[in-house]
Amino acid sequence: MKIKISKESVVYQGPAYEDSHWGEVQFPEIVRCADGALAIKTHVADDSWKEFGKNQDVWCISRDNGQSWERTDNSVVSQTGYLLPSGDRLYFPLVTGVTCKRSDVKEARIVTQKLPSDRVTKEEDGSWPYPVFMYRDIFLNANHIYDLETLPDEYAKKEWLAYRIAKGETEAVPEKVKIIHPHMSVRGVMGNGDMVMAPFSPYGRGFRFDKEGNIWLTSYTGAHLNPYNGGVDVCSAALLYKSTDNGHTFELSGYIPYIPNTTKHPNAYMCDGFSETALEFMDDGSMIVLLRATSVFLGAPEWNSMYYARSTDGGKTFSEPQEFDKCGVLPNLLKLDCGVTLAAYGRPGIYVRATSDPHGVDWEDPIEVMTGEDRSSLMNDPPKRPNFHQWAGSCCNVDLKPIGPNQAILAYSDFYYPDQSGKTNKKLKTILTRMITVE
């Protein structure tokens, strides 16, 4: 098998790394418009729950299948969505995390304050409830874990905001999608100010479809309540949801908890568990997933192993997760019509792997798109000793979508790309794409 990767194309250029927030010019997402054009959404605000969902994105559009790009109005979001078997298009936007005033937050009952008779229930007066559990992360933020059903009525709804473009239409209509998830929990984080809740949105990108035409998407929990018994788990778990009604309802249909093992992985107790998850259905009917296990909030570094697991019973159970590579955030899996499945991921560096194995077990070696070595010498003003973000020179949050039976388009960021306008000699934060072709 031969994998050909094209030269990069510039989608969007923002400020220089030195003049921007972490989170700015990151998280490129590729999605189709109802008229067939390709669009890329880029986050251009801080990487914060308070900033998501505030229309702080840049949208660019391509009408030649990704060969060239131009900026477009943010209203294009109403014309985009992932195609469903029914012909509808569906899109889940990230929403803004709810802010709760510090004075309204009840302190967690811990140690001797906790009694055998205590029950965490909904407050009759509509006030904020007691958390089920509280812990502090490496930055000393207080993380409160709540049973969703105990929150005030306006926040206790098991539903996600979606935009649906009905088959034959060109404009999206907002829709509340029902969620079926036992013991569903939500996390609030409080530092020096008010408490901010995790955005109540699914975190997966796009959908996958099984042989029966059911719609699947992925998400993850953060610290959470076990859906089987309500037990507290401070490690994040991967979630798989399935819809059998054209995306109007999603039911929890796969749960992959994180089980630390320092014998195999020295950072096991510091990496915060499984988060971003990629899913693909293989030709033999099995499901494979790639699992991010990188997080700094319990003390781990900005990089960590990425894991692979496989299910042969429709997501009810998964094999024990095994290391897929030494790094991997926001992993992508994509099965092309030619029968080859691609994986894309990174941090540090950006890599593409491929397999023609119908079981998804045997993979080719990684192909390097961006080096995982120190890139800080490319900065406008290189430091003597870089921090990790300067070292990587990219958020390494990639997206991968099909554009042909044997071709995909990869979107990623490069923080040190020369200004293409000719107005400055600076290196700028840039969103790039490359074509990946299976020959």
Q: Which role does the model predict for each range below?
A:
Residues 1-439:
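Asp-box/BNR beta-propeller blade signature and adjacent active/binding-site loops
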